[in-house]
Design a protein with these regions (language model features):
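Conserved alpha-helical substructure of the radical SAM core
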Residues: 1-129, 227
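Radical SAM enzyme [4Fe-4S]-AdoMet core and its adjacent flexible, acidic
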Residues: 124, 133-135, 140-268, 274-282, ...
Length: 362
């Protein structure tokens, strides 16, 4: 989850400085784990009874208090997510409460619940971006993957309502065995609608379901490598051959000259955080190695605890020294979700990157 996409140069510079200083400049708040769809690969969804047994959802006042504490600690960018955030009873109230605090807000949604009335209140003070997860290019794919036979039509209606009001939209798409056949149409649709799209070929195992390393609902490493290749073909078009040549040149010339040091290799836990619906703060939605509840000890203490944990975490030395790392997307979250430990190499990612290099070289 990325609360700081679509940055201007000044904002990018701020975020880079926050990384170096350990300032929590950006966060994600999961408002609830409930959803109106039932996607096969979902890592977050709970039933209402499961949620209540674990922790009831927190109120507007509780979240607005945490938002105030986070703002004082340096947070500027916030992503509101779920579950499906448009199921949260006080979303509009919380959204505008945080807007008044000066937050730059984005929202993650499946888009199926956005009607004209919802689009109207969003348009009064639009989010930086409304990120819609696009699961396919037909109602049939939505039926098979998400259990919603009208999902695609609902999303297209939402897009129409949002575009009428000049609300910035971005599509996110994660490829699975259930929607890989729609890849070309998904990309074509984003181009026709002039909506930027981020298509993911790597699917994290559902760590919350105690399914570490579970591959049932994701592509094999070889399939994911092939998908990555095709995504880049679509993205770069006529410049694809030049992109491949440049990537392979970087790979062949790469030598690790930086000394190994502890810490995560991304922004998670360095300047970005995730807060589960129950209030537990972690570096990322997929890291399970350190949780601290913001409602128990306050935001600043929770952030400092996670930040110090991240700074002292030992990621695999093998990954640090690996020549493929220049083309590999491995991170702490992939190590934890693949193996249950940050110290172990995420072999699925190794295989994926190796297959990808073979595809590009040939």
């Amino acid at each position: 989850m990325d609360p700081i996409n679509h940055l201007n140069p000044i904002e990018q510079n701020l975020c880079n400085k926050a990384d170096l200083a350990g300032i929590p400049i950006a966060g994600n708040i999961e408002l609830l784990p409930l959803c109106n769809m039932d996607c096969k690969m979902c890592f977050a969804k709970m039933t209402r009874s499961q949620m209540e047994a674990h922790s009831p959802m927190h109120t507007y006042q509780e979240w607005i208090d945490i938002a105030g504490q986070a703002s004082e600690a340096g947070t500027i960018f916030m992503l509101l997510t779920g579950g499906e955030p448009f199921l949260y009873p006080d979303l509009e109230k919380l959204y505008y409460g945080m807007k008044r605090m000066g937050y730059v807000l984005s929202i993650n949604t499946n888009g199926t619940l956005i009607d004209a009335e919802t689009a109207d209140w969003l348009a009064e003070d639009p989010p930086r971006r409304l990120n819609i997860t696009l699961y396919g290019s037909s109602d049939e794919t939505y039926r098979n993957l998400c259990g919603n036979p009208h999902g695609f039509s609902q999303v297209m209606n939402a897009v129409e309502q949002l575009k009428k009001r000049d609300i910035s939209i971005k599509f996110n798409c994660s490829l699975t065995p259930y929607n890989i056949h729609d890849l070309e149409d998904i990309y074509r649709l984003s181009q026709e609608l002039e909506i930027p799209i981020d298509i993911g070929y790597y699917m994290f195992p559902p760590v919350r379901s105690n399914n570490i390393g579970n591959v049932q609902y994701r592509l094999t490493a070889m399939e994911a490598a092939k998908a990555r290749y095709r995504i880049e073909e679509l993205r770069y078009g006529a410049a694809f051959d030049d992109y491949v040549a440049y990537s392979l040149k970087k790979y062949r010339e790469y030598e690790q000259t930086e000394p190994y040091k502890a810490g995560y290799t991304c922004r998670s836990g360095n300047s970005v955080y995730w807060i589960n619906y129950d209030g537990t703060l972690s570096a990322c939605s997929f890291t399970t190695d350190c949780f601290v509840n913001v409602f128990d000890c306050g935001f600043k203490t929770a952030w400092d605890t996670v930040y110090n944990h991240v700074k002292n975490s030992q990621m695999p030395l093998e990954c640090h020294n690996c020549k493929m790392r220049i083309l590999c997307g491995y991170c702490a979250a992939s190590a934890i979700s693949e193996n249950g430990s940050i110290h172990k190499v995420p072999r699925y990612y190794c295989d994926l990157t190796r297959y990808y290099i073979c595809w590009t070289a040939n």
